[in-house]
Amino acid sequence: MSETQIAPLTLNIQYTKDLSFEVPGAPAIYTLLRQAPTVNINLDVQVQRLQDDAHVYEVTLTTRAEATHPAPAESGNGAEGGKDLTVFIADLSYAGVFTLTGIPDNQIEPVLLVECPRLLFPFARNILADVTRDGGFPPVMLGPVDFVGLWQARRAQDDGETIANA
């Protein structure tokens, strides 16, 4: 039995890299809402290597929540009827600095694009829920995310672009 074992994945630090919350139609939008708005979520993962001589990476989980509500039919102010109004836009980039130790090269990509975002996700979900609630709206509660599926879709897209550029 060895005296010290080094964890293969170490989360050195995690932090809010960028946070933005906008309510472009305030305060009027609050009087129009009679039900929860429709919320569209976009999620992405970016990785940046921080040290050339070591496996130290910044992994950023980027989330954008954009809520819309149907425009009132009798606007009377020249606004386009039928076009959805933007209720709020929340942008969050939540990052962590990870050190990988003893992970085979062929496993680094899935660790960075699947396991690292999995560790960051609960914190990002909580921040997004808090900021939307504090903005006067029902909290946006993100459901579980299939990071394996996102990684596989990214690989398939990258493979398709490689073939198209050949």
From Swiss-Prot:
GO cellular component: cytoplasm
Compartment list: Cytoplasm
Highest taxon of the lineage: Bacteria
InterPro entries named in the record: SecB, SecB-like_sf
GO biological process terms on file: protein folding; protein tetramerization; protein transport
Keywords: Chaperone, Cytoplasm, Protein transport, Translocation, Transport
Chaperone listed as a keyword: yes
MF terms (GO), sorted A to Z: unfolded protein binding
Keyword Nuclease: no
Pfam family, one: SecB
HAMAP family in the record: SecB
Family: Belongs to the SecB family.
Described function: One of the proteins required for the normal export of preproteins out of the cell cytoplasm. It is a molecular chaperone that binds to a subset of precursor proteins, maintaining them in a translocation-competent state. It also specifically binds to its receptor SecA.
Subunit and partners: Homotetramer, a dimer of dimers. One homotetramer interacts with 1 SecA dimer.
Protein name: Protein-export protein SecB
